[in-house]
Structures are given as structure tokens and as C-alpha cells.
Amino acid sequence: MNYGYVKVAAAVPRVKVADCKFNAREIEKEIIIAEGKGVQIIAFPELCVTGYTCGDLFAQQLLLEEAEMGLIQIVSNTRQLDIIAILGMPIAMNGVLLNAAVVIQKGKVLGVVPKTYLPNYKEFYEKRWFTSAVDVSERSVRLCGQVVPMGTDLLFETADTTFGIEICEDLWAPIPPSSSLALQGAEILFNLSADNEGIGKHNYLCSLISQQSARCIAGYVFCSCGFGESTTDVVFAGNGLIFENGSLIARSKRFSFEGQVIISEIDVEHLRTERRDITTFSACRAHCAPGEAVRVSTEYVNSKELNLTRCFDPHPFVPQGVELNERCEEIFSIQVSGLAQRLVHTAAKSAVVGISGGLDSTLALLVCVKTFDKLGWSRKDIIGVTMPGFGTTDRTYTNALDLMNSLGITVREVSIKEACIQHFKDIDHDIDVHDVVYENAQARERTQILMDIANQTWGMVIGTGDLSELALGWATYNGDHMSMYGVNGSVPKTLVKYLVKWVAENDMDEASRMTLLDIVDTPISPELIPADENGNIKQITEDLVGPYELHDFFLYYFLRCGFRPSKIFFLAVRTFKDVYDEETIKKWLQTFFRRFFNQQFKRSCLPDGPKVGSISISPRGDWRMPSDASSEMWLREVESLA
């Protein structure tokens, strides 16, 4: 099973300018290498059969004939292979010369795509030799003894995907041919290029491809010539780049003196989901009305067992590397701006937050502090309420008080023990029975206290629940589930930890920083069950519902990508192979789907709160799901996993 992945390659072969036999042999070698690695489609650079830098030699009949002989050699010697190859070469026909891409498979030429936009400025002189596709009316060409379709509107259909082709400068045009190809169904776009180097040009190139890939919601394979091309005036670095929907997933080593084959997998299943979700894509297809494409069928590619080369981030919600600081600041600013608008609009006099000494309430408090500072309001109008109960430990209690005091907010302490004891008497519940009644009564008592204090102080209760908890329904209905504005509702648990740590290290004095770092290291717990005999947390959330890093991984690929359970399991096993065994992953995947469906009723009445990332489960925004939807199909697929 390939799970919707199509294995593609960008090849940068060694080249000798105007030596077609040598170039054909190098191309053959890389096709054979790619076939052995399960590649389904491989692209080569622009004019790779002759070399791009032949100059006025393109006017020589010998070069053109040898180029076709080189193509015949490649076609013949790869006729037993399943792989589809896209080669660049000059093609002479009816008194003109075309800079073209030729698609071959199993001993046949499938089609020819000529270049549309010929650069004729600065170091480029292509119009000196070549004719643009727009000036050619023919729709077929004789090549290698075959008459094959020709045009810029060819779409090549395989059993797994549809792809289209453009050549180098085509991408730089205001409306590239690939835009039309994508609107007509191309899911993967190939660009055969001869892109020379210049200071800063590579970053611009990556930005350009990223934008086109994202705009077309497509895979984009860019392949440019490298070592061996003439360096009379310019240098070619051998750029092989593979993008998917705006993200770079594979790249070549620039300035290599050897041939390279860069391989990765395009997730066409995900691209199809994105195109369905982003309705402007189909709307553009209707409004722009591109002409009807010519569809070319390919032979069935023998699907080998998928050997996925792509790596997947175990923490897809968490920014990495140089992006970390910028993204954390951006996320924090979204939360702050959302809360500020709500406070100003309601003319609230205070913000009331329940502080447990855990991660979520800590982040909510930090958002409140930053919001009040930015509005120029006194921190004393932030009322932090610690409400110790039967399961509160010294560690979390101390951290809650230390944090509130170091931040200079108003601190209130209201124990819930006596109120809960009385409540248990009122409803005739045995206090020694630590069941759901015992736990939820405490959560609802805390919410009642916060709501009443907010009424006392003309304030708003700020919700602390995060995206991961809400996805799993790990919240007491009308308890911690409820607030007047929830700032964390779109922030997953794995990201909460990074945000708190980021604030600690970038925006806090030493006392606050040390407290925050200890909170980050504290086991996640609702602390509704009494501590153990040593005073340590007994009720650890991740022992009960599973590791949050797994659930956040499941959540991302379920909601963001629309993947089915078997595909999520496949990716999770690969990604966490050194952390969890398959049975553990399957167990928690089953828990995830069971709880996600069963707990939708809590998400159907969530308080308002700002969307932060690409995923939100607000019933008014991103996620509108009936509370009584059946989970049977999803759970059945999980159960069937080997």
C-alpha cells in the first residue's frame, strides 16, 4: 500500500557540452539507479541530452541528429523499466527549433512539451536559436520513429497521479503554464531548468518554487543542470528541489562535481484533500476557464513496496530551528491580541484565572500579564485564584503562589475541600470513592468560584484548556471546559510547553524564570485524586489517556491532513520507532479516535477563543461535526491494523 505517496526524483547528471553519447549514457545510469529505488517519475535538466550551453552549435545539423540518436539510445536501453523519465533536448520540426521536454516510458515516447517563455535578456539569448511554443501550431511531432502528441497543455496520467511540465523561464512568467496545468488536474509539476547561479538568486528561486507549489496546491519538482556545463560566463550549481504545497521536502547538494539523484515522495492524497478544502482552487478553475488539456496515458507502473524516504516531525505543531523564536512570539501575540479585544469590548475591569501550577493555567496567566501590560492596565487587576483540593501537591501549590507573586498580580486562595465535602454529603456520595463524581465535582466547584469572583470584580474568567485536551475531551463538562474567553483553545499541549519555556527564557526575571521552568518539568495532571504517601502526584494524565506527543501527532494528521487511521499509524510507527512499539501506538490511536468522537458534545459548546495555528476545533469555525457521529469506521480500521 502506498498511502497516496508518489516517489519522484530530480536528476542532475554529469554532462559534456555537445557530447550527446556521453550525456545519454549518464542519463541512462541515473534512470536505472532511480528505477532500483522505486522511483515512479524522474526529471532531468533542460536540454540535458546536448547540454544547455551549446550556444550557436544548436544550429548544427549534426548536434540535432546526435541528440535524437541519444534519445533513441536512452529509450531503447530503458524499455524494460517501469519508470517514467522526462528529458530535455532540442527538437527540430518544420523549419523551427524547439527547446522541449520529452516524456518516455517502456521504450516509447509519450509526449513532447515545448518551452513557452524564452528568456532573451542579460546572459540569456534563447530566442537566437529557439522558437516559443506559442508560435507553433502543430499538435504532434515525429520523434524516434513515432508520431507523438506535442503541446504545453499535455497532462500525463498514471495510475496514481497526473503530472504536467514546464521549462525553466516558464516559472518566472506572471502566469506560469503550471498554473493552468494544476487547474486542469496536474497534482505534480515538473520543471526542467538551466538556472545559473548569482548572489542571492538561490533563495529567490526557492521562494518562487515554494509560492507556485503552494498556490497550485501541488508537488513541484525542479531540476537544473550542474557541473559540466560551460562556465565561459556563468556557473550552474545543479539545483534539484522537491516541494510539496509550499514546503521543501528534498534538495540536492549544490555545486557538486558528481551526478546526483534526489528522491522523495509527493503525498498526492494530501494534495487532493487540500484542493477539496480550499474552495478557491475549484472556483479559480471555473472562473479562469483554461482550455481543455490533452491527456496522455502512461503504462501501469509496477508498485514496489513503499520505501518512504521522507522524515516526519514528531512534534508537527512545534516550530523548529531559526523559526522557533519568531513563531513563539507570533503565537503569543495572537493570544494577547484576541484577549485584549475581548476585554476592551466588554469593558471588563479584571481578568480572573484559576492557577493550578500546571502548564495550561500558566500560559493563560502569562497571556493575561502581557495583555494588561500592552493595554497599560495594572497587573493588580489580574486575579489569580489558587484553589487547593484533595489532590493538590506541595510542588504545584508552591509554584502557583510563587508565579503569581513574582508577576505582581492579585493573589486569592480559596480551598475547595470543605465545599466539596458538603456537596458530597448533599448528594449522598462516599468521599472515599474516587470516581468520576469525585473528580468532576472538584472541577465544577472551581469553575463556580471563578465565575463568582468574576462577577464580584466586573471581570472575565479566562479559560485555560488547550487544543489537545479539548480534542480528547479531557475536561469536565461545564467545569474547566467552561470560561468567558479561552486563550489556549487552539494551542496543542506539546506547543504549550514550548511557549511557556520560551517566555521563561526571553521575557522573565530570574525568579519567574525558575518557577516557569519547574512548571515545565512537572508531570501533567488534573490533581483530582489525592497524592501518594510521599506527597507526589498520583494521577498522571499521560498514563491515563496516553502521551500527548502521540495524540498531537494523531490530531495533526487527522484534522490538518484528513488522513485515515491506517496512514496515521504508518507514519507514527516510522516517526516514533525509537520511542514506542507498534502495539503502544495502536492502543493510543484507538483511544484517540474513541475519545475524539465521543467527546464532540463538549466541543460543540466551546467558549470563544482565538485561532492560533492551522487547526482549530471551534464549532463556529474550523470544525463543525455532529455530536452524535459514529466512530465505528475509524475504530474498525484501527482494530484491523497489523
For each feature predicted by the language model, list its residue ranges.
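ATP/NTP-dependent adenylation/nucleotidyl-transfer catalytic domains that generate, transfer
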Residues: 7, 18, 159, 216-218, ...
